Amino acid sequence: MAEIKVGKNETLDSALRRFKKQCSKSGVLSEAKKRKHYEKPSEKRKRKATEKRNSRK
């Protein structure tokens, strides 16, 4: 989980911006989107195979 400490003279906007950046770097949102619905292991293998094939092109 992403965690930041807000400085004394730091505005809420800048703290929120830092928090969002840290969340995107750690992959929290993408992981939550993946886990929103259950993905069967066979579907996961198919998806990874197609991603691998597409990345080679």
Swiss-Prot record:
InterPro entries: Ribosomal_bS21, Ribosomal_bS21_CS, Ribosomal_bS21_sf. One of its GO terms (cellular component) is ribosome. The keyword NADP does not apply. Transmembrane segments: none annotated. Keywords: Ribonucleoprotein, Ribosomal protein. Residues 33-57 have a biased composition (Basic residues). One of its GO terms (biological process) is translation. Pfam families: Ribosomal_S21 (PF01165). GO terms for molecular function: structural constituent of ribosome. Coiled coil: none annotated. Residues 22-57 are annotated as: Disordered. It comes from the Bacteria. The keyword Ribosomal protein applies. Belongs to the bacterial ribosomal protein bS21 family. PANTHER family: MITOCHONDRIAL 28S RIBOSOMAL PROTEIN S21 (PTHR21109), SMALL RIBOSOMAL SUBUNIT PROTEIN BS21 (PTHR21109:SF22). NCBIfam families: S21p. This is Small ribosomal subunit protein bS21. It comes from Natranaerobius thermophilus (strain ATCC BAA-1301 / DSM 18059 / JW/NM-WN-LF). The lineage of its organism: Bacteria, Bacillati, Bacillota, Clostridia, Natranaerobiales.
